[in-house]
Every structure is written in structure tokens, then in C-alpha cells.
Swiss-Prot record:
Official protein name in the record: Diaminopimelate decarboxylase
NCBIfam families noted in UniProt: lysA
Annotated EC: 4.1.1.20
Catalytic residues as annotated in Swiss-Prot or TrEMBL: 314
Length: 386
């Protein structure tokens, strides 16, 4: 793609590149699935926290699902109204609660009995509580991002809901919240989880529900079938006066590419390594989840060589892609990593005292905008007290 080469020439590498057109199209697809539903769509800021991208999603009618004060600040910088912010997470401290209340956030997903006790002590006005329940449903995804089983740290078991409601019946509980995991590509886990939670909602007369997210994308083959999701899930949601959904990866991952420059090609015996200028410091997903990302070399085609694409860091796990067929690669070539818009920059790090990458947006009119400058080495140490 010529535009990616142009970005690399202007802004260097490693660089994340996002396409506004794709971002808007994917956000609209989400809303189309829920046609006829009283929907509050929210974007999961953990997937990508750049306020420029969040502003685009705000323009598309999205609120924000946030976990931390930092994610809330990102939403505020994007101009997202407080009444469309949902506070999620399993480790809310009293100090954080007081901060979010000062920022006028009023929709809260409560994760535990213990958390609700703190809310009861604070007794804030106007807070709408959604209780995260654990439906004991296997999402059939990577264990690190599966969240719907009793062994996981999230939510309260459905069988404990009666005692929860009895204990906190004086609180302004508006509905239930369920989120069984991430990168789910089959409809069946959603159907199983939602059927349990919808029945529980009816038992308590709840007219609102938060169904979480978890929609999987096509990294290497299968993507969630939205037509099947619409057919099997959405009809039961139309009875609710408000349905909250939190979608991150599905919207932003296909909108982004990671550009890396080949430093050298290392050959030994029958093994080849293409060494690039960013590894698990800029994209940790392959190292952390054994995640697969399609890659291609700008301006080259063919399958002349088979190699691991590896980063420059001091770990054998510092790998972008294993055993890929590539054209004959040379130092200076640019490799593009697909579906890199989610959990890329937000999980980047300074390991080996490397700098975080730049972020660039390609506007709908084709204009290239720098939306986050590349870190410098001095940025890494600016908070050190000597």
C-alpha cells in the first residue's frame, strides 16, 4: 500500500497507522447489528486509548467503557460526556471511586460483594449500578482473556445473586452485566451466557442490561458471524429499555497496521530470522498470547524464503511472527502487521529502555496526521528522581 510506505518515509518506524474510514465503518457495523434495540454503545478504551480515535468514535455515537483514571482522562480529552461513560473493573479503590464521582461518572459495573459494601458506605447520589455476574460459560478463547468461568477473578456467581440482591436491595441496581471474554468467534457462548443472564434479569424485573463485548475478528481465519449474532442474540434484548454493549477489538483492530523496518536478515544452517526494529516492546500479543497476525512486505510479493520475524530485544520470545513464507527480504524493507489497532500501543512498553512508537491517522480525505509522537529516550527517564 503506497500510503503505508509514505507514512514510513515521513514518520519512520516502528509506527502504528490507523485508517479513519475503517474505524467509522466498523463502528457503524456494531450499531447496525442492534437495530431496534435501545442501545448505549461503548468503546472499550483498553483496546486503544488514543483520544483522537476516541473522538471519532464519540462522533459516531459511542460512549466509553473505562477501567482506570487514565482511561477516563482519555475519554475526557476526546470530549466524551460523563453520562455515556461506563466504569468497569474488578479493583476499584475508595480513592478511585471518589475521583470518578467528582468526574460525574454515574454508570458503574460492580464486580463483587466487597466492592458494593464500599459503594454503600460512600452512598453517592445518582449512581446506576450494574452487577457483573459470572455465568459459568466457557468462551472458547485464549485462557488469559477468558472471563466467564467461576475460576476467573471477575463477577459474582449467578447462584449468589439472590443473597447479593437481598443484602443490597436499597442500592440503585439497574441491571446485570456479563462479559465472558475477548476474541470470541463463535456465537454459541454468547447465546448460552445471555440466556442465563436475561432469565435472571426477568426474575428481578430489571429493565436494563449490560451485555459486555468480546467480539472476535479475523486474525487468521474465523471472525464472529454478525448475522448469526443478530438472529440468535438480539431479539431477546429488545425487551430492555437500555442495553449497554462494550466493543473494542472488533472496531479498532482492523483499522490499524504496525510498520516495522527490517534491520538485518540472519541466516544459519536452514533457519532464517528477519530482524525488525520493534518486537514485544511494540506488539506484545504474539509473545503473551501466541497471537497470530498476518504480515506483508511493502512493495514485494512472492514466497522465496521462510523465516521467523523477530524483534531486537533480549528475549527468545521477542517474536512478531513464526515460520512465515516471505518474499526475499532485505535490510530497509518495511513489514506491515495487520489487525494491529487493538491492544498494540496500549500494551506497548519500555523493555530494554526502548521507546514507544509513534501513532499516525490516515484521514478519510487521505491526509496523514501524527496523533502521538514517538517517545524519546529522555521521556523514559523524565520521572526519575536523582
Amino acid at each position: 500500500m503506497d500510503i503505508l510506505r509514505k507514512v514510513a518515509e515521513i514518520h519512520g518506524t516502528p509506527t502504528y497507522v490507523y485508517f479513519e474510514e475503517t474505524l467509522r465503518k466498523r463502528s457503524r457495523l456494531v450499531k447496525e447489528v442492534f437495530e431496534g434495540v435501545n442501545l448505549l454503545p461503548t468503546f472499550a478504551v483498553k483496546a486503544n486509548n488514543n483520544p483522537v480515535l476516541l473522538k471519532i468514535l464519540r462522533e459516531e455515537g459511542f460512549g466509553m467503557d473505562v477501567v482506570t483514571k487514565g482511561e477516563l482522562l482519555a475519554a475526557k480529552l476526546a470530549g466524551v460526556p460523563s453520562h455515556t461513560v461506563v466504569w468497569n473493573g474488578n479493583g476499584k479503590s475508595r480513592d478511585q471511586m471518589e475521583h470518578f464521582l467528582r468526574e460525574d461518572v454515574r454508570i458503574v459495573n460492580v464486580d463483587s460483594f466487597e466492592e458494593m459494601e464500599i459503594w454503600r458506605e460512600l452512598n453517592p447520589e445518582g449512581v446506576e449500578y450494574f452487577i457483573r455476574v459470572n455465568p459459568e460459560v466457557d468462551a472458547k478463547t485464549h485462557p488469559h482473556i477468558s472471563t466467564g468461568l467461576k475460576k476467573h477473578k471477575f463477577g459474582i456467581p449467578l447462584e449468589d445473586l439472590d443473597s447479593f440482591m437481598e443484602r443490597f436491595r436499597s442500592m440503585n441496581i439497574r441491571g446485570l452485566h456479563v462479559h465472558i471474554g475477548s476474541q470470541i468467534t463463535r456465537v454459541e457462548p454468547f447465546v448460552e451466557a445471555f440466556s442465563k443472564v436475561v432469565r435472571a434479569s426477568e426474575r428481578y424485573g430489571f429493565e436494563e442490561i449490560n451485555i459486555g463485548g468480546g467480539w472476535g475478528i479475523n486474525y487468521s481465519g474465523e471472525e464472529l458471524d454478525l448475522s448469526s449474532y443478530r438472529e440468535k442474540v438480539v431479539p431477546d434484548l429488545k425487551r430492555f429499555k437500555r442495553v449497554i454493549v462494550e466493543i473494542g477489538r472488533y472496531i479498532v483492530a482492523p483499522s490499524g497496521y504496525l510498520l516495522l523496518r527490517v534491520v538485518l536478515v540472519k541466516r544459519r544452517h536452514n533457519k532464517a530470522f528477519v530482524v525488525v526494529d520493534g518486537g514485544m516492546n511494540v506488539l506484545i500479543r504474539p509473545a503473551l498470547y501466541s497471537a497470530y497476525h498476518r504480515i506483508f512486505v511493502l512493495g514485494k510479493q512472492g514466497k522465496e524464503m521462510r523465516a521467523d520475524v523477530v524483534g531486537p530485544l533480549c528475549e527468545s520470545g521477542d517474536v512478531i511472527a513464526y515460520d512465515r513464507e516471505l518474499p526475499e527480504v532485505e535490510p530497509g524493507d518495511i513489514i506491515a502487521v495487520e489487525n494491529a489497532g487493538a491492544y498494540g500501543y496500549t500494551m506497548s512498553n519500555n523493555y530494554n529502555s526502548t521507546t514507544r512508537p509513534a501513532e499516525v491517522l490516515v484521514r478519510e480525505n487521505g491526509r496523514i496526521s501524527l496523533i502521538r509522537r514517538r517517545e524519546t529516550e529522555m521521556d523514559i527517564f523524565k520521572d526519575v528522581v536523582m
